[in-house]
């Protein structure tokens, strides 16, 4: 995995810690930065940003697909550091949310932007989206390899 496995591990660990904190201490919405950022516990039976709620089998297959695809892509010998980082972020995020689904039957979301109407999300979701963004950016730069 070309030496960046720590990124996936860090994402997974950060996701688990924030979810355990939210599960234990976050009972209702809390504003961190007025009008900008807050925390609000929400049980999500869907995937990132509540998409596909009520389809647990499809979500499990999709999570396994992301994990498998990221793992296979990381086995590629000439993958640049941006692509490696993006894939590791996706791997850690997918593993974090899959662990929730397997352990609880739902994913705990808690991060909320207050200045726009948007879904509540978690660290794993943010890393999945950021990792995808890095891969797309790299593709447009023409740097997905070497």
Where are these regions (language model features)?
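Alpha-helical transmembrane bundles and membrane-interface segments of multipass inner-membrane proteins
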Residues: 1-146
